């Protein structure tokens, strides 16, 4: 269940959900999925330049899942993270990678300073009417903005059924959210950017309790009452063990990648 929430910018609910990760930073770092090497290959292909040596700012870096991958590719990467708990977890896990505090709506970066601006699982927390102009300000001529999200592969039956269960339990329309997240025009309602889209499928096998901890690190669960969250995760555990009796869950993701060059 990795679909981004509706970007109700300025709403109390949106702000509460955005802040909810700080208290669960260790859980997030331990159980959230990473990204496949093929995704970074696609970033290089669509931007037309190697990551090695590029000046990259990874915004909404969280605990550093994507930042570490960019660093390993040889990018000169700087993490930008607004949350206290997430930033503390990042610094604990990646002491050799620089981090500054800030967010995409007001980047703490100089004009024309960055070859590549990345948002892994984080663009939907920004207000694109502010974050698009900020991206264009800090990108160098010829630079690019890359956005990506792990999204559940909903054509796989057990994943589709899990989404339906979550929708029924919480009264949310998950399929509508997935359709909304796939609309590239919502990434930039200002119309200043021209995105190229690519999808990369990948999977991982993890213990059922790790899968449940991954689900539990999503904002819609972090902000709900503890008794309701516990009841939902217990129900999910029972259902998952019917599909995966050995207790090992195969998660499958379609990474949605959007890349736009600076006009």
Residue ranges and their predicted role:
Residues 115-129:
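A short SAM/SAH-binding and catalytic strip from SAM-dependent methyltransferases
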Residues 3, 183-263:
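Conserved Class I S-adenosyl-L-methionine
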Residues 1-52, 86:
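Conserved class I S-adenosyl-L-methionine
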């Amino acid at each position: 269940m990795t679909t981004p929430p509706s970007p109700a910018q300025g709403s109390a609910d949106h702000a509460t959900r955005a802040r909810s990760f700080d208290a669960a930073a260790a859980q997030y770092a331990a159980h959230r999925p990473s990204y496949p090497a093929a995704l970074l290959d696609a970033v290089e292909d669509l931007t037309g330049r190697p990551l090695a040596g590029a000046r990259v700012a990874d915004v909404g870096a969280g605990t550093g899942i994507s930042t570490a991958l960019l660093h390993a590719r040889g990018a000169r990467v700087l993490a930008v993270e607004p949350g206290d708990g997430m930033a503390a977890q990042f610094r604990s896990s990646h002491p050799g990678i620089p981090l500054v505090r800030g967010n995409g709506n007001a980047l703490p970066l100089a004009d024309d300073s960055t070859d590549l601006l990345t948002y892994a699982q984080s663009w939907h927390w920004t207000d694109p009417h502010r974050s698009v102009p900020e991206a264009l300000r800090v990108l160098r001529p010829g630079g690019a903005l890359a956005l990506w999200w792990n999204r559940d592969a909903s054509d796989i039956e057990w994943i589709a059924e899990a989404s339906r269960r979550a929708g029924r339990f919480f009264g949310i329309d998950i399929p509508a959210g997935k359709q909304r997240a796939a609309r590239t025009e919502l990434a930039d309602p200002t119309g200043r950017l021209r995105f190229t889209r690519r999808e990369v499928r990948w999977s991982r096998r993890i213990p059922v309790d790790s899968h449940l901890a991954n689900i539990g690190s999503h904002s819609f669960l972090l902000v709900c009452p503890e008794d309701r969250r516990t009841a939902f995760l217990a129900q999910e555990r029972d259902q998952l063990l019917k599909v995966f009796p050995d207790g090992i869950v195969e998660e499958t993701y379609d990474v949605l990648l959007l890349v736009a060059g600076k006009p």
